[in-house]
Amino acid sequence: MQQLAELYPQHISELQSRTKEALSREGIDGLIIHSGQAKRMFLDDNNYPFKCNPQFKAWLPVIDNPNCWLIVNGSDKPKLIFYRPKDFWHKVPPEPNDFWVEQFDVVLLTQADAVEKHLPYDRSRFAYIGEYIEVAKALGFDLVNPDRVLNYLHYQRAYKTDYELVCMRQANALAVAGHNAAAAAFKAGKSEFDINQAYLAAVRQSDNQVPYNNIVALNENSAILHYMEQDVVAPSESRSFLIDAGASFHGYAADITRTYCNGSIPNSSHFAELINGMHQVTLSLADSLKPGVPYSDIHIAAHAQVAQLLHQFDIVNLSPDDILAEQIVSTFFPHGIGHFLGLQVHDVAGHVADDRGTPNPPPAEHPFLRTTRMIEARQVFTIEPGLYFIDSLLADLKSTEKSKFINWDVVDTFRPFGGIRIEDNIIVHRDKNENMTRDLGLN
């Protein structure tokens, strides 16, 4: 894409600037960033699927090649040691020739264990950034993943460059195509397994290429927050469908959730109305993302709006304010309202107050909130309110004095549908918000 090529030099310039500041804080000369290496399964000769170091893929869209290295110091042209072995067992990556190549001095590495000759001779003033501590020690690095460096780099990752925003829009476009295909498969009565296959075919990515394991849940399975099973047999009656699934583009993630209802099923009209109500909650909360507002305030607002739904649909026989006062909402909405999104699905530095890593934990009453940062321009968030009928949490509630406030007959009519989550991906700009998910056609 020409747009990526035009924006990429500024992206590298920003990473150089961040690197220079991180190095000055640690008092060192440079970073050696390791893409990672193949990891063998225990007592086996097969490897786990390769997952690239996010600090490596922040620099360039090489996300599937182990044994690569970057040498960066914030001033000189970054050096890329690109692994290209002689190998007749596996596909060998081609020599780099994409839009990003001119930003690097590229050296080809044919043997993974021969990297030492390409690294700085005196590594005492360089820090290794990566997962493989034993490799770092064998190569003579004393400084490994220093906190001051990572705290600063992680904090700054919340602010996306124009190049990164284009990548994230493209990831959303891919995911939207997948969600549309999955919705069609649900309407055709397909199994969870077949719905997932339809999704993957539409995004043109495998299970190992999408940014996380897709959640594809029919009926009561929609009440399991991280349901991963994917039954191969379609149920005799497909009442509801929740899909939480994303896509990757150049290492950046989309993370989208939708819930659907089969309108031909008895008692489905109220659940369909509840889904529509949750769409309005998502849109309202997305509009509330403003620079200068703590993200935790969005979560508190989500609880208030879910309380309104619990009252409106006669699930709880209390006013919304009293539902909040009795702390009933968390039974039906037990997770956080969202998180940072970027190179990682749950992107880093959500629980810090500054670029030195000062902790800023979530409130005790909302322990699962993944982000407590102040909202600022160029940050990207998910907004994902939900309302679920989870047997274990409902049983806990029923054993308390608060049970008398619950209309259990209504709860029981909703249980077969499982639950609802509606999740959009939002870019916060200085004077507006950009709902990538909706703008790209998924309503």
UniProtKB/Swiss-Prot annotation:
Enzymatic class: hydrolase
The protein's matches in Pfam families, at most eight in alphabetical order, are given as: PepQ_N, Peptidase_M24
Family matches, as InterPro entries: Creatin/AminoP/Spt16_N, Creatinase/aminopeptidase-like, PepQ_N, Pept_M24, Peptidase_M24B_aminopep-P_CS, X-Pro_dipept-like, X_Pro_dipept
EC assignment: the record states 3.4.13.9
| Cofactor details (free text) | Binds 2 manganese ions per subunit.
Q: Per the similarity annotation, which family is this?
A: Belongs to the peptidase M24B family. Bacterial-type prolidase subfamily.
Q: Which NCBIfam families match?
A: PRK13607.1
* Descriptive protein name: Xaa-Pro dipeptidase
Q: Which organism is it from?
A: Pseudoalteromonas atlantica (strain T6c / ATCC BAA-1087)
